[in-house]
């Protein structure tokens, strides 16, 4: 099994290519690592390949905040410089510089 190099990094702010939400990456799976039930719930015509990085996001849209699991092929960098308003931001990240969040060094 070979792993693909991730395009995005922890702390990057990204947006979805097809749906109206954005978020900050807090974890990366270098290939699909969720349930088969979750995977099959995605409509077949938009179901992503499993052999690519998948990202865990603290996500938001105009109405709510939530956590999302998104394939690399469906993400773009978000260069808006707008902060993410997710309530867990301060638990995971210690600050923001430019368009990326960072974790405090131990």
Segments from the language model and where they lie:
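Intrinsically disordered, low-complexity, charged/polar segments
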Residues: 47-106
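Charged, low-complexity, helix/coiled-coil-prone segments
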Residues: 27, 35, 74-76
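Mixed-charge, Lys/Arg-rich low-complexity intrinsically disordered regions
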Residues: 1-13, 18-22, 29-32, 103-106
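Intrinsically disordered, low-complexity segments enriched in polar/charged residues with Gly/Pro
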Residues: 1-3, 43-45, 88-89
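Broad hydrophobic/π-residue packing in well-ordered secondary structure
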Residues: 21, 43, 54-55
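Short, solvent-exposed secondary-structure boundary/capping segments
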Residues: 32-41
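Residue-level recognition of conserved beta-strand positions in structured domain cores
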Residues: 25-27, 59
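Intrinsically disordered, low-complexity boundary segments flanking structured domains
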Residues: 12, 41-46
């Amino acid at each position: 099994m070979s792993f693909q190099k991730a395009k995005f990094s922890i702390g990057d702010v990204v947006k979805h290519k097809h749906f109206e939400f954005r978020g900050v990456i807090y974890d990366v799976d270098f290939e699909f690592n969720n349930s088969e039930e979750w995977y099959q719930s995605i409509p077949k015509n938009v179901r992503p390949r499993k052999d690519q990085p998948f990202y865990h996001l603290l996500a938001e849209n105009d109405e709510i905040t939530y956590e999302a699991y998104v394939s690399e092929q469906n993400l773009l960098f978000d260069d808006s410089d707008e902060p993410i308003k997710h309530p867990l931001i301060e638990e995971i990240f210690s600050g923001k510089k430019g368009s990326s969040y960072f974790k405090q060094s131990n």
